[in-house]
Regions:
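Membrane-interface helix-loop junctions and terminal tails of multi-pass membrane proteins
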Residues: 1-117
Length: 117
């Protein structure tokens, strides 16, 4: 008797990577938007703050997407084959997410503390 796969196994790569990237992108945009008032407090105009915020968010998203996509193919293969995920793959996936989050924090810190002469 064939083993019934879970439904999410069929689109393993999409269900892991795309959804994760979209969630991280929204989180990054929200994070940057919350930092715009801080940037304005240091004497920058709203449009300047928004430009910096958009650039930081897009660069952060690009880095995050790279880390997530690099780590996730092995995860999606495991999903498609068995519908299960090993501890090592789960750890690798979490590490890639954390790396993306750290990149986002670093970009925002540089953006807030950098001098704009």
């Amino acid at each position: 008797m064939a083993v019934k796969r879970p439904t999410y196994a069929k689109d393993g790569f999409k269900s892991v990577s795309t959804r994760g990237c979209i969630i991280e992108f929204i989180a990054t945009m929200t994070y940057v938007a919350l930092c715009v008032p801080s940037q304005m407090k240091y004497g920058e105009g709203f449009s300047t703050a928004m430009v910096y915020g958009t650039v930081a968010a897009l660069l952060t998203y690009a880095f995050r997407k790279e880390t997530v996509v690099q780590m996730n193919p092995s995860v999606s293969v495991a999903f498609m084959a068995t519908g299960k995920i090993t501890v090592e793959q789960m750890v690798a996936n979490v590490v890639s997410q954390l790396a993306g989050a750290l990149i986002g924090v670093c970009w925002t810190c540089i953006w807030l503390t950098g001098s704009n002469d």
